[in-house]
Amino acid sequence: SQQNIDIAIEMQEARDIPIKVAVLDDEGNETGEMVETGETVKGVAKENHYLLKMALYSELKMDLYVLPIVEKLAQNYPKKKYWTQLSALYGQEDRQLDQMGALEAAYDDRLLDKQREFTALSQLLFMFENPRKAAKVIEDGLNQGIVKAEEKTLKAAAQYWHSSKELERAKPYYKKAAKVSKEGELY
């Protein structure tokens, strides 16, 4: 029942020991199978146990408890989906520095594969006064073909290099941005 789930979760959180929850079938009847949802003696639960715990909290509309679980998933099972989900959750909590850190960890592990991820990371790096790394990230995305060579991304690369006082590295990006620009301001 809902009350038993709440009590089990509360007890597990209070003592930080493993708990077992009965598995229910589609009709809500117990199947006789038990699933451990807590952390093991070593301090790290199986990935599916964290996912089950996260699903329970989501189902109970206890979103406050989801973030620490995603943090553990990203730390113990460093997959792209956990790093990007963690970054998004930090963003929702207005924790931009942590948001940047999660995306940067995914980038360092070569997990990013979407333009929006490269641009988000480069913007956060620039915002936190690291224009050189911002330029390297956007340049890396451009070189890999993940980031499209369009005016706004080329202009961003140029501005990031310019801000890091690397004018020679900024020039080619300003030129490329000017070529694809519909306006003449970059010439």
Regions found by a protein language model. Give the residues of each.
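Alpha-solenoid helical repeat scaffolds
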Residues: 1-187
